[in-house]
Amino acid sequence: MQLLKSCHYHVCMKVFIQENSWLAKLAAAKLKADQAAIVFGSTIHLHNTSRAAFLANKEWLCHELKHVEQYQQHGFAVFLVKYLLEWVKKGYYNNRFEIEARQNESNISLLKRVSIM
């Protein structure tokens, strides 16, 4: 993941947003949800929500930014494997990475560590 030199005195991650993503559409179908966001690396893929609506929903945004941070901490391939194994063992809701993301939904400090492209 590419890092910027600084972002409001913090190390800053570049985060991309992809609207109308087929990946997010698949996630929505699997979760039986009308809307979905799914993260791959530093890109947040959206289904049935606009970039503006997603960015306005700070809890949802912080949840997905935590996943971006998890990718950064573990590395792309390692995180993806760990996440999928956790999902197979415990399902979506009890997946430790989802629990951590839910616990960070009000962590607005995540917003200071990213630059949304």
Which residues make up each language-model segment?
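Metalloprotease/metallohydrolase-associated module, dominated by Zn2+-dependent proteases
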Residues: 3-48, 74-117
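Short pre-active-site segment immediately N-terminal to the catalytic Zn-binding motif
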Residues: 44-61
